Each structure stands twice: as structure tokens, then as C-alpha cells.
Amino acid sequence: MHFVDEAFNEVFAGNGGHGIVAFRREKYVAFGGPAGGNGGNGGSVIFVGDKGENTLLKLKYQKHLKAPHGINGKNKGQNGANAPHLYVKVPLGTVFYTADNKFLGEILYDQQTLVIAKGGKGGKGNKALATFKNQAPSYSEKGDLGESFKIKTELKVLADIGLLGFPSVGKSSLISAISKAQPKVASYPFTTIKPHLGVVEVDGFSFVVADLPGLIENAHLGCGMGIQFLKHIERCRVLVHILSMESSNPYQDFQTLNQELKQYNPQLLLKKQIIVTNKMDLPDSLKKLTLLKQKIKGQPIIPLSLVSFDNLEILKYKMSSFLQNTPLEVNPNNNNDFKLYTLTDNLKTISVIKESDSVFVVSGNQVEIFFHRTDFNNEESVKRFNRILKKIGMEEQLQKKGAKPGDQVKICDRLFDFL
């Protein structure tokens, strides 16, 4: 299957169903009263972690994710049905952002759910709107709009250990030697163009190792596999630098690798590192290894030959030891298994802007919510909308901005006269 680790989508939560105006009309029942039911809630767009998924290929080609709308209320006080949610399966390690790169949430566990776009609330029917002062209202509420916006989705592979190095240093050969993974192995650069995962077991302790695409100088600027490669390293708890003794200067290669990590994210240098010198069967490899050990202090260096498999078990035990002594990283943005993200801000915020001498623009979630709930073809519904605006202080704010009787007030796409 083609590996895709980035997708751009637009999510549309369902609108709430409309409440209706109805009255109880039965024989021998005088003054039956209001009987209009409420609308059902719109469906939300919910992403679900699935350990069986390993690519964002489906999301790449499914640009629009739409949840169904709630059902309108019915007479005899019957409420409309809530719409089913739209569940979208994604791989573990999927991260969600808005179009302007604001973090929404991430999926780390199997069956973990993340509500990205919340469905609209169903509107109230006239039965639910009845009060002591108005026992038979002739108006109802329209359903709230569901949230809709563009998102960016990234997959950062979940692995305990990441193998990194320049192209053709032996990463794919190493992961196939220590696990049952079978990546493509060839003698030309960039054979690995997608991450490969392998499970390694040492004395009953198992962990996941990722063979990541080859890194080149200036990868943090987008060269080679660029950021598509570097972002996968962020998940790994331990990094294994694979240096080829075929190189004229393995130490310089090591410095270049760490410089690329630093330029992308300085926090990556805080991760534990193991250095592997591969191709120790080549001439002059021992001399290069001696020079390397003189320059690099305090980090384990394991000489390796994937021809004779020397020191392979030592490397596996070192990986296991490092992992068991490295605490799991906790993402501060993801404290709960269930995360609800909503684009709405403070409901009580009202903004009044003077657009011209006689036109004032009013915005704010509370105003816009009641605007969309109002049926402007129903006079009683419009009167209720005006009462609500006065109650939440809009009239007072307009007067502070200099609004006079006869001026116009713009709310969403509609103009009103200021009286």
C-alpha cells in the first residue's frame, strides 16, 4: 500500500434539526397547548485510532468529511432523531492541526477518539419554549449550525527507537537482521522512501524499531526527504545513529546528523543516542573507529558488521537497556484519552465595529448562535431575537459606539434598523 503521512481535509459537522410549531388538537381536549417537538442534534466528525491502519491514504483522497444533519422535530411533542456521528479511522500517531497550524489533538492509542468538529444542537420546538408568561408560543428555534473548517493531518510513526543515518549506511539491513521486518534493500541511495517498523524482543521485553528514510545535509530546509522524514523522529524515545565506515569521515557525518536534528527541533538532542559503526569488515575501519572514540565521549559506540552479524546481540541488549531506563514521554497537549476540540470562543463576547457613519457590525458567538436559531419569517421569533439581544447588552454597546435611531446594524448577512 502507498504510504501517505500528510493529508488536507475539510470537516463538516451536521446541523441540528429544526424545532417546529405545532399545537395539540384532539377531540374533547380544549386548549391542548403547544406540541411542537425539538430537532435532533447534528452528527459530529470523530477520528478513531486503529492499530490496523498505517497510512493516511484514505484521507488524502477523501477531501470532504461530512456528518449527517439532525432530524426536524414533529408534532405531538415528538423530538427529531439525533444524527449518527461520522467516525473516521486513522493510524496511531496521527496529529491534527487547523489550516493555520493550530494544534487540535492527536491519536496515540487504539480506539482512542477525538472529536474534531462538533455537531449543531437541535432547535427547540414551541412545546419546550413555553413559559409561564407565554404558555402557547407560536415560534420555534432552528437548529444550530455544525462546525466546519479545514484541517491538516499528519502521521508521525509511533516507534520506541529510530534508526537514522545518511542514505545507504545499512539501516534497512539492520532492521531486517534484528526483527522480522522486510524493507527493500539495495545498493543505491534512498532505497527507503517510507518508514518501516519492526518488533524486536529481548528476554521477554519487546519494542518497536523504525527504519526511517535516509537523512542528508540541509534536511531541515526540505532537502531530500526533508521534514517528511524528520517529523517521524519526534516520537522515538531513543535514537540510533548508524555511521558507515565506508565514509571518509564518520565523525563529520555524526556531527552533520546532530546539526540537522538541532536545526529542526533542539529537543531531539535531549534523547538518548546509541552510535553504531557499520561495515566494520572494510579496510581501515578499525583506524576510523579509534579516531571516532577519541572524539565522541560519553556515548556508547557499537562496532557492527551486517556481513558477519558481529555484535548484533550486544546492540539489541543496549537498545533494550536504554528503553527500560527511559521514561515514557508525556505530551502536555494530550492529557486525556478523549479530547473535544471546539472552535467556539467565549459565548458572552460581543464585538461592535463601526463600519461607516450609519452602519455597525455586530459579531460574537452568542449573537450568531441566536441569529441562526431565529426564523426571520416568523414575527414572534424575530421579537424574541430582539429581546435576547437587549438582554445580553448589545443595545447598550451600540449606544456606546454612537449608534442612533435609524442607523443600521449588520449581523451575519442581514441588516437591521436600530430603533
From Swiss-Prot:
Transmembrane segments: none annotated. GO terms for cellular component: cytoplasm. The keyword Cytoplasm applies. Its cofactor is Mg(2+). Its EC number is 3.6.5.-. Residues 342-419 form the OCT domain. NCBIfam families: Obg_CgtA, Obg_CgtA_exten, PRK12296.1, PRK12297.1, PRK12299.1, small_GTP. An essential GTPase which binds GTP, GDP and possibly (p)ppGpp with moderate affinity, with high nucleotide exchange rates and a fairly low GTP hydrolysis rate. Plays a role in control of the cell cycle, stress response, ribosome biogenesis and in those bacteria that undergo differentiation, in morphogenesis control. Belongs to the TRAFAC class OBG-HflX-like GTPase superfamily. OBG GTPase family. PANTHER family: DEVELOPMENTALLY REGULATED GTP-BINDING PROTEIN-RELATED, MITOCHONDRIAL RIBOSOME-ASSOCIATED GTPASE 2. This is GTPase Obg. It comes from Aster yellows witches'-broom phytoplasma (strain AYWB). The lineage of its organism: Bacteria, Bacillati, Mycoplasmatota, Mollicutes, Acholeplasmatales. The gene is obg.
